[in-house]
Amino acid sequence: MNLPHIKDDAMPAKENRIIYSHIGLEGWNASIEKYLSDGGYAVLAETVKRPREELCAEVEKSKIKGRGGAGFPTGTKWKFLDRKSGKPIYLICNADESEPGTCKDRLLIYQDPHKIIEGIMCACYAINAAQAFIYIRGEYINGYRILQKAIAEARERGFVGKNICGSDYCCDITVSRGAGCYVCGEETGLISSLAGGRAYPRIKPPYFPAVKGLYDCPTAVNNVETVCWIPEIFKRGGEAVSKIGCPADPGTHVWGVSGLVQKPGRYEITTGECTLGELLHDLCGGPLPGRRFKAIIPGGSSMKILRWDEKFTVKNAD
């Protein structure tokens, strides 16, 4: 596989921290005071004043895709919600990060929980959800406690619960811990578990979550990273977001790198602006001294192992 080091005369690959804007900042903590000091919940306060149809249209114009792996356009997913059923609409934030070695959402949960909460509440208002749920990986015990505390802080300040930001909109968030079941990464399996049943994926159709989801009600299931994009879309505008990075998959993606590299970690990179070789050499510092790359697992343990000397072709922008 040809993964050449970036040329000396080219601009080195850099991060573009939008979702990770607070991660690793000196003096930053998970408190609501710190989040408010950087303009936190300002987008939510403006969101509840805007027409819902306009907000959903902005998400569709942004072309932002789900960050959980399936890559389905978020605006299209919301468009499928059955708003005429007379049943309540639910939103589930999928924080069941169970792919071995994956922990991109964990950083947001532990260090920036209020960004997640603001994203959830902005999304809930846009789709007129009656209740939101966060389904968190069972092993994230401290993360569960951090989210519970953050939600209580937000509720006390009027950002969650009744009359959000002084409006007539009411919506609360419930956090539910999983039990270490890998299949809950699939949305219908997650819904079955959240409803108290066995975490078993359901047949589509008829069980499209947008039509027949949690408690057989219309349900939107969005990943942690995805909901964090919602305030950015409402603040910047859908068209502006659609111009960030690759047109087929706008925005940024958080990439986690582990193994024998000099700087393992999570890196937020604009789509289409960094090759795998640049990520490994420039951002991660290359292999440890005296070691060399032999193979790469590009998407977790469920993917094919790519040999270092193997040649391959990327067939599309995704």
Predicted regions and their residues:
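Hydrophobic alpha-helical positions that pack around
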Residues: 144-271, 283-286
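Iron-sulfur (Fe-S) cluster-binding modules
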Residues: 1-62, 129-134, 278, 290-291
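Histidine-anchored nucleotide/phosphate-binding helix
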Residues: 112-126
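Conserved phosphate/anionic-ligand binding catalytic regions in large, soluble enzymes, centered on
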Residues: 61-81, 180-192, 196
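Short amphipathic, charge-patterned alpha-helical segments
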Residues: 119-123, 272-289
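Short coil/turn connectors at secondary-structure junctions
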Residues: 15, 53, 61, 85-89, ...
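Gly-rich Lys/Arg/Thr-decorated short loops/hinges at beta-loop-alpha junctions or inter-strand turns
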Residues: 35-41, 93-105, 211-214, 255-262
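Small-residue-enriched alpha-helical segments and adjacent helix-cap loops
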Residues: 54, 65, 133, 137-183, ...
